[in-house]
Each structure stands twice: as C-alpha cells, then as structure tokens.
Curated annotation (Swiss-Prot):
Source species: Salmonella typhimurium (strain LT2 / SGSC1412 / ATCC 700720)
Protein name as it appears in the record: RNA polymerase-binding transcription factor DksA
InterPro entries tied to this protein: DksA_N, DksA_RNA_pol-bd, DnaK_N, Znf_C4-type_bac, Znf_DskA_TraR, Znf_DskA_TraR_CS
Keywords on record: Coiled coil, Cytoplasm, Metal-binding, Zinc, Zinc-finger
Residues the record lists as binding Zn(2+): C114, C117, C135, C138
Coiled coil: 34-54
Amino acid sequence: MQEGQNRKTSSLSILAIAGVEPYQEKPGEEYMNEAQLSHFKRILEAWRNQLRDEVDRTVTHMQDEAANFPDPVDRAAQEEEFSLELRNRDRERKLIKKIEKTLKKVEDEDFGYCESCGVEIGIRRLEARPTADLCIDCKTLAEIREKQMAG
C-alpha cells in the first residue's frame, strides 16, 4: 500500500484538503448563515472528492499489481493486502454516503443542528467532524447507552 493512502483524517487535514482556514465567527453573527454554509459545503465537497480519488487509486493499484504468483505465500500476502485495501475502501464508501447526506442538509439549510435535541452543534465541532449530526451532549449520552447495551 502506498504511503499516505492509509492516513487518518483529522480536523486539520480535512480543512487542509479543502484549502480553507478555520472559520472566524464575527460577533453577533447568525448561526449557519450563508457564509458558514458555504464554508462547510467547500469542506464536504473537497473531502468527498479526496475519498473518491482514493477509491480510484485503489482500483488502479489493484489492477496494476494483480499478479498470479506461483508461490502460495506471495499470493496469500497479495490477497491479504487487497482484502485490507477493500475493507478500507468500503469504510470510505460508507463515509462518502454520509458526506453526501450531509451535503443535502447543507443544500436544504438544515445543517449544523442536533438531530436529537435541535440545539446548535457548533462551528468547531463541525470543523472537526463535518458529518456530525448530534451535539456533544447527545453524542456522549448515545455512547454511554451504547456501552451499557454492550456490557
């Protein structure tokens, strides 16, 4: 696997992918105004495009690297590498769907509010995780419930 293809995406790299600086709120500025929606639309579109490029590179890499190794160990190693790449791409495919769902919310001007309680999620949280659909309090409660159900 090529270096850089398997990196974790932090909030700073998401902003860097989009080529934008963290949003600077102005005093008294209305939450999720046109400028903020545009800011997040740029971030989400750039992130989605970067993930799509990763998928395309994986397909090309797998086609270029596919070889019928006579040695079973070499063949097994290649199959394991391809399997790992496909699992990563499957996760990215699911993330692309979530990004597209979030872009629809931006278009509908329904972005940035908690789906559970309706409060503002907040600019900084959304820059860290643009697909967040719960405020930090509701997300914390959901995680506590999830742990209780699992344990």
